[in-house]
Amino acid sequence: KKANLQFYKDNKIKNIGLTSPHSVTIPGAVHAWCSMHEKFGRIDFKEVLNGAENFARKGFPVHEVEAIAWKENEKKLKKNPNSKRLFLNQNLSYSYGEVFKNIPLANTLRVISKNKIKGFYQSEITKDMVKTLNKLGGLHTEEDFYNQKTLFSKTITNSYRNLKIHQCPLNSPGLVVLMMMAMTEKLNIKKYHPSSFERYHLQAEISKICFEVKETIFGDPNFNNINIKDYLSNEYISSLCSRINKNKIYSSKKSSVTSHPETIYLSCLLYTSDAADDKQC
C-alpha cells in the first residue's frame, strides 16, 4: 500500500533489483491453495501439505542440477544471515546427493495446514515476515498481508486438434501457451519426427516469438486492454509463423526477453472417477 509512485520518485529509485526488498510482493500462493481447497477440495487440507512438510522435515538428497545452481549462488546466500543459516552447510552450499532439511519451512507448513489462511496471513509468521522486510528497507505492513485475496477467473480457450484447451487469463502466460499451440498446428509440426532438427528448431522459434509478444505487448489486464481473440486469430498466428525461417535463427529486433529466475508450478489431482463429481478435486 505504501509502495506508491511518489515514494520511488522521492527516493530517486529508478530500478528495483532482484534482491531488493521492494521487489518482494505479498505472497499469494498460500491464499490460493486454501481458497481452492475450500471451493473444490475433498481430502483434508492437512493431507494436501503433508508430503511437502515431510520432505522439508526429514530431508531429501540434492539433485545434481540443483547442486550446481546452489554453488553458483553461494556468495549471494552468504550476504543474508537467514539465507546463510537455512541454505548453507558450514558456510558451503549443499552438494549433489547431500541430504538437505528445512525444519523452519516444515514448521510453517504445519501451521498453515492447521490454521490455513490465518496461519500465514494473520499470525506470528506474518509479523516475522514484515519485521524482516522492514529491517531490509521494505514498506510492507501486516495490513498488506491481511488484505491479500485470491481471484477466481474464467479460463481463456482455443481449439487444438479438435480439443478445447483451457488456460489462465492474463497476466499469466496462458495466452502465450495458446498462441504456441496455434502456431504448431499452423506449421503442421507433427509431420516432423519428435527428435528431429526441424522439430527442435520450430519449437524454439515458436517459443521465442510468442514470448517476445508477451514481453512487448501483454501486461496487467487492469491497465492494459488486450483483446485475446485478436492474438489467436488466423491472421495474427499466420503473421507470427511468417517470421520463422527454417534455415535461420530468429532474432528479435524490438527487445530482448528478460530472464525470470523463478516460477510456480501448480497441479490439481482428481480423486474421483464419478463424472458428476468432476468439479471436485
Label every PLM stretch briefly.
Residues 174-190:
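M16/insulysin-pitrilysin zinc metalloprotease superfamily fold
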